[in-house]
Amino acid sequence: MQTVSETFAGTITVNRQMRLALPRMAMSLLIMSYLVADGVLISRFVGTTALSALSMSYPLTALLIAAGFMIAAGGGAVAARALGAQKHEEALRAFSTALTTNVMLGLTLGLLAWFGLDWVFELLGIAPEQTEFARDYQRVLLPATPLFLAAATFEVFYTTAGRPKAGLAASAASGITNVVFDILFMGPLDMGMTGAAWATALSWFIGAACGLWYFMREKSPLKLELHLPDLKLLRTAAGNGLQEFVSNLSYVVAIWLYNRVFISHLGTAGV
């Protein structure tokens, strides 16, 4: 297996750039595809009110994702720069810092949101008829936030390590898990929104487990060694990823505003 340095050695041609970029693009499209499938299946098995509850509560999930991607993207940039300077140990520290920080961040924010769900739902403007659906979904999903942020960190570092195809395979496994268990839990087992949340949580677990297995192997191009976060690298990573956070935050605010306008003028059916 090539090392990371060997992967990026030599002249970087357009073809080489595309070989690295296309799997990452396909990964993003795949993630969006199974999110759409998730919504379709919820509408089919649970109903349109449940789907609107998912849409109304989504800004909460998206905000947690935005915070995690800031660290993941920033950490990936720090690691890539270190690899370019032949500082392999610094790249490994950046990887460990991004992963451990995101797991701790996901655990902290997820639990805070879990205990403050009623206040969050009021802020988001969730209607009374949507509340039970949203609560069933978020009570399962929020404690699993560390799994998603770990999987998101691994997605970034597959590309940093020069192995975007491995990331695409992990995303495919995660997406297939989500759809299969959506059908099983909401169909034959009739678990409603709780089933949809468990299917999503299981898909996050698969994504995190794939990344952990891949990067903990001895032959991994960027072998993960878990340590406490390096605060200096963490500050740099957060600074590098700030643009990613602001971009995602604007998306969260836009969704929240659209939802508030739609529900005030069209009711739950319009969300």
Show where each model-derived region lies.
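Residue-level signature of transmembrane alpha-helical cores of multipass secondary-active transporters
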Residues: 20, 24-28, 62, 102, ...
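Helix-terminus/linker motif at the lipid-water interface of multi-pass membrane proteins
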Residues: 33-52, 121-128, 184-191, 245, ...
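Short alpha-helical transmembrane segments in multi-pass integral membrane proteins
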Residues: 1-21, 79-146, 188-242
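Alpha-helical transmembrane segments of multi-pass membrane transporters/permeases
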Residues: 89, 102, 158-183, 194-201
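Hydrophobic transmembrane alpha-helices of multi-pass small-molecule transporters
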Residues: 63-66, 110, 178-183, 207-212
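Small-residue-rich hydrophobic transmembrane alpha-helices
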Residues: 51-111, 148-167, 259, 263, ...
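Small-residue hotspots at the loop-to-helix junctions and early N-terminal turns
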Residues: 46-59, 134, 138, 197, ...
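Transmembrane alpha-helix boundary and packing residues in multipass membrane permease domains
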Residues: 24, 28, 39-40, 77, ...
